[in-house]
Swiss-Prot record:
Protein name, entry field: tRNA(Ile)-lysidine synthase
The protein's Enzyme Commission number: 6.3.4.19
Gene Ontology terms: cellular component: cytoplasm
Residues binding ATP: S32, G33, G34, Q35, D36, S37
Classification via Gene3D superfamilies: 1.20.59.20, HUPs
Reactions mediated catalytically: cytidine(34) in tRNA(Ile2) + L-lysine + ATP = lysidine(34) in tRNA(Ile2) + AMP + diphosphate + H(+)
Lineage, top ranks: Bacteria, Bacillati, Cyanobacteriota, Cyanophyceae, Synechococcales
Gene: tilS
Length: 327
């Protein structure tokens, strides 16, 4: 077995400490061809003899540009040359928005995780990505869940606890480290030219805003934002756990609805988490902050009071001691 570098050992330590992966697992690697995903794939391959993993690779071509399609062809050839089991998916129709592209990409990951019977989907997000996500979500407006959303692991489908785990073994590394690793190992990284397009707000944040903040406010900005995300993650997990304990006391599935008295007596943070969980069950999509707050207001409202209409023709109405969802 080849000797492991300090970077390999750091990633292996994170895998063990965070309990991300287990020996003998079948892994699906989300592979863009950029430096982070190349670094991830190489480290997993180097650790494979010690862990006995079976590694499968998926690349998604969004067809946003001719360059992206050329990248897909190049990566497919390289993966074939390496003898790695892989698939390349091409978007049809093309999803022009980030949210639509992400949803399509996750659909492909779910499909291939099932096809190859993979229990973990491994992604190459780094601490640099986590810092950017924290600041991006803060600027857009979000709570603790959004600020700490890029975590070490989560379910591929957050509504399905049986879905594969998304794991991020590189969250302890920064982007400059993955770049250095790829250079040292002469990996054929494909540069994503769209990452330089300042028309995309996320690119402007990464290329202009964060360097400015580092220069004028905090040279260790990425580390500071990662610490904040870690702290908020632990606090959010506490609220979620306490809300889970309260849930059987307030949820009435037959209605469906919530008992107002015990929920009204709970702290506001728990009220919001329970309301978010309830609305996520009855609505077609996760609720917004305003939709959660509309439900919270009804906990103290008079009988017969109702919320504004929610998506899908749903609304909440006070019926006695219950807050009931109608459709």
């Amino acid at each position: 077995m080849a000797r492991l570098s300090p970077l390999h050992l750091r990633v292996q330590c994170a895998i063990r400490q965070q309990q991300l992966l287990h020996p003998g697992q079948r892994l699906l690697v989300a592979f863009s061809g950029g430096q982070d995903s190349f670094c991830l794939l190489q480290i997993l391959r180097d650790l494979q003899p010690r862990w006995g993993w079976q590694i499968f690779v998926l690349h998604c071509d969004h067809r946003w540009s001719a360059d992206e399609t050329e990248c897909a062809r190049f990566l497919q050839g390289w993966l074939q040359q390496q003898g790695l089991p892989h698939a390349v998916e091409t978007a049809d129709p093309i999803r022009r928005d980030e949210a639509g592209a992400r949803a399509w990409r996750y659909q492909q990951l779910e499909k291939w995780a099932r096809t190859w019977d993979c229990s973990a989907v491994v992604m190459g997000h780094t601490a640099s990505d986590r810092a950017e996500t924290f600041l991006w979500n803060l600027l857009r407006g979000t709570g603790a869940a959004g600020l700490s959303s890029l975590d070490w692991q989560r379910h591929l489908d957050d509504r399905d606890p049986t879905s594969a785990q998304v794991v991020r073994p590189l969250l302890g590394l920064y982007r400059w480290e993955t770049e250095q690793f790829c250079q040292q190992h002469q990996l054929p990284v494909w540069p994503d030219r769209s990452n330089q397009d300042l028309a995309h707000g996320r690119n402007r944040l990464r290329l202009e805003v964060m360097p400015y903040l580092k220069q004028h406010f905090n040279p260790q900005l990425e580390a500071a934002l990662n610490r904040a995300a870690t702290l908020l993650q632990a606090e959010h997990e506490l609220v979620v756990a306490q809300a889970a304990q309260l849930w059987p006391q307030v949820y009435e599935p037959a209605l469906p609805g919530l008992r107002r008295d015990p929920l009204r007596a709970a702290p506001l943070a728990l009220q919001r988490q329970v309301m978010f969980q309830f609305l996520s069950l009855v609505l077609p999509h996760h609720p917004t902050f305003e939709q959660v707050e509309a439900g919270i207001q009804l906990l103290k409202a008079d009988r017969g009071s109702r919320s504004p209409d929610y998506p899908g023709g749903h609304w909440l109405e006070v019926k006695g001691d219950h807050l009931v969802c109608f459709h």
